[in-house]
Amino acid sequence: MDRRLLDYDLSISQKMDQQFGFHTIAAKMTDVPGHTIGMVPALAQAGIEYLHLGVNASSRVPDVPPMFLWKCGSEEIVVQYAGDYGEVSALSNGTVLEFYHAHDNAAPPTPQELDDLFETLAARYPNAHIEAGTLEDFALKVREIKHTLPVITEEIGDTWIHGVATDPWKVSCFRRLLQLKEAWIASGQLLVASPSYDVFMENLLLVAEHTWGMDVKKYLLDFTNWNKKSFIAARANDHTDETFYDACNQALLTGMSEELHHYHGEHITSSYSKFETSHQEQRNYILRAVEALPEELQEQAKKEFAFSWPSVPECAPSFHANEPIPVGSFIVTLGAHGELLQVKNNVSGEIKDLSLGLIEYETFGGKEVDACYYDYGRDLKDNYYWSEPDFGKPGLHYHKEIRHNIYTPTPVSVRTDNNTLYVFLQFPQEASEAYGCPREFAIVYFFENHAICMQIFWKNKDAIRSPEAIWVNINPQVIEPTCWKLNKLNTYISPDHVCYDGNRKLHCVQKLLYHTNQKNIVITSLDAPLVSPGAKTLYTTDNTFEDLNNGFFFLLYNNRWGTNFKQWYEEDMRFDFTIQY
């Protein structure tokens, strides 16, 4: 989300405070392993003093103190981390916080359960006064000892953030609406103090929420059909049940049995189409946001969402890679895979050496997935039956034909028209037939004196169930790569200033900034916010920082996540990038 949407989110609790005579100074985030430090200014300015982060029981916990002062510039909040949804917290002033959580999507405790809880706590703390309270009550006690807390200035990030790229269309529309919103507000076309604005923003908030569909292990149920051919047949058959857990995953089925019967009743059955309806339900938040707008703005939004395959004039001249190509007032050179390697301005004589637009298609097998699962996860012995379907791909390792591969394209047509360069690409046939690589890609480059604009299109992509990723590399080849900064919520963050066991590999950004006394470069990715600094690192979860001399790898699509996310993608797509000098 952007800063205005986050501020709107925080304003909801402020309005409720006014309505109910409450004063919110505490916040709680449960399940997701972390957030960006870019949130700190917004939270602090909204009056939030204390943030509790309760991490999913099998996810890696960032290596930060249990309680600390998170400082971003002049703004700060107290953050408390727990290795589960909530743990016991004892302050030096004699205050103890005990959480009593229900399970996900479960009802609140019964009166009897609360009576039992108070009895248990009375035995545990025989000399204490025990009362039900709010996080605000605890935050006031934290305020008393705030000055004793360690200070953290590092980014933490979110080690689940790869899920952002599971539905490129939805995220593209979301990002374009955020950009349009700013233009509409500036022009007076969209009034902040209007009912339509509230409905618009509320639906955008629902897109940003971390659950994006039905649970794979409860509603798709299929951990058998990883092979492309069998997946296509199973999807067409459109029936799943507990037998799709397969013989090799019976331990998972046993662990999940109680929950499965709770959700399905006696007969555990589902279907691919039922699972897919939940992803359309999530996309509908985009449609509802648009429907809330005045008619004129609705039309603008629909035009912004629309795109078509690039059309080149018949008279446009043809060229090849590795030769000088005149494009308007520029001379450019392409590499063997269609990437832009050099741009010379014929008027100023300035030459830019870079690597822009190298697209790569990556597939993964059970070896890579299992290694990531065991490296990233914790307490797996206790939580294996739900954590492996969430973070792994159960049964994939039995399919030896599904392997790790990195495919690169070949230019099949290079054409020019005025200041525009068209590059049409194809990947090796295996990437599309055995896996899910789009059969056709096009890159359109627009050249200006101080900017290069790049559009990437793909079409004819097959859906597959096995893990895949589509990357594009942008590398302006700067002299001092440590000067790059990530823009998150209007806060600039160094890619190498991320805490141990935070997300050092993937970031969701609004833009990238390179700033020195000699040069400024801004990279803006309108549609694809997920970026891996220095290397392609979807299934790499170690704590090394990658080499920024290699540039940035934008992750256009992946299906690593299990749980509540789309598991395949087959639609045509378009992505816009701008590199400003």
Feature-to-residue mapping (PLM):
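Catalytic-domain carbohydrate-binding cleft regions of carbohydrate-active enzymes
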Residues: 1-267, 274, 417-581
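Catalytic and substrate-binding regions of extracellular carbohydrate-active enzymes
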Residues: 198, 206-209, 216-460, 569-573
